[in-house]
Every structure is written in C-alpha cells, then in structure tokens.
Amino acid sequence: MEFQGERGTGPGVSSSSVACSQVTVSRELLTAGSEGSGGIWDQLLISSKPHPRKTSTLQTVRMQRSPLLDQVQAFLPQMAQANEKLRREMAAAPAGHFNIENIDETSGNIIQMDVALFEMSRSDSKEEDSPEESSRDSSGDSSESEEDVCVPSEVTIENIKLPNAEGGKGKIEILDSPASKKKKQ
C-alpha cells in the first residue's frame, strides 16, 4: 500500500501522486476483509455475483386456498343476480316507485338520518367578527344594508345555512314506531 496514515504534503510530493495514492487506498478499502472475493464492493453492487457458499435457491411454495376467497366468490354472483333483479324491477315499476324521497307509510320501518358534511368557513363563525361589523355595531347606525335584510326566498346551495357541526354527538329520534306506541299505551 502506497499511502498510509497522513498525507504527504511536502515539496517532494506532487498532487498527482497524492491523487493516485488515494485511488489505491480506496480500492484497497473496498476489497478489505475479503480474501479473493470482492469484499464490500460485491456486497454494495446490486448485480454482484452470488457468493459461492450461499447458493441457496428460492423455492416456490403453493399457498392454501383462502376461505375468504371462497366466500367472496360465492357472494359476487349473488350480488350480480340481485343487481339484475333490481334493474328489471326499476324498469317495470312506475317512475317514482324507487325514489327514496317519496315513501308511503306502508313501507315498514324506516330510518331517517339527517347528515351534513361540510367545512365551516371562518365567516360563518359568530366568535370572529370582522372589524367593519364591530365598528358598525358600535356606531349605532340604525339603517340596515341589503345584506342584513332577511327576505324569504327559495333555498339553494348558495344560501343554505347548515347547523353548527361543533354541537357534539348527533341525536337519534325514533318517530312513530310501533314500539313507541306500545309504551305510550
């Protein structure tokens, strides 16, 4: 090994000899610890040759059939048949028969859920008033702007006000069920 320990930086050592010795040291370090094989160099390379002692062949093993797969394969044809039956019933039934908004009282038990999913903007919160609103309130101006006047109109997506979602858990109410009628009697 040409270069060990400190670098030779004197008047007699040229920069080309220092560079050459660093390359030699790097190669020696990469092959260190391996007697004849490539050492760490072969371990770092992806396409390195397999070690002759570690010639283990990978074996393909057949996995057992999953019971879940059997259940899914049995269920999917049933679901396809049910979908086809529903399509035929929808084609044969009157227009409003499958409309979930229009139900008759003979349908049996019905669960009605009012679900609102939205992101509340900062302008909707009552805690944060803008400086203009607070100055207008403090000035005592009795004239109302067009925005403040509530005129009943058709409810659209733009003007609907949804309830505050921070109220906690939702409340489930049972309306006109046979069980509640029995309790009242």
Swiss-Prot record:
UniProt-listed GO biological process terms: box C/D snoRNP assembly
Residue segments, region Disordered: 121-185
Presence of the UniProt keyword Amino-acid biosynthesis in the record: no
Modified residues (Phosphoserine): 34, 66, 177
Molecular function in Gene Ontology: box C/D methylation guide snoRNP complex binding
Compartment(s): Nucleus
Purpose: Client-loading PAQosome/R2TP complex cofactor that selects NOP58 to promote box C/D small nucleolar ribonucleoprotein (snoRNP) assembly. Acts as a bridge between NOP58 and the R2TP complex via RUVBL1:RUVBL2.
Record protein name field: NOP protein chaperone 1
Gene: Nopchap1
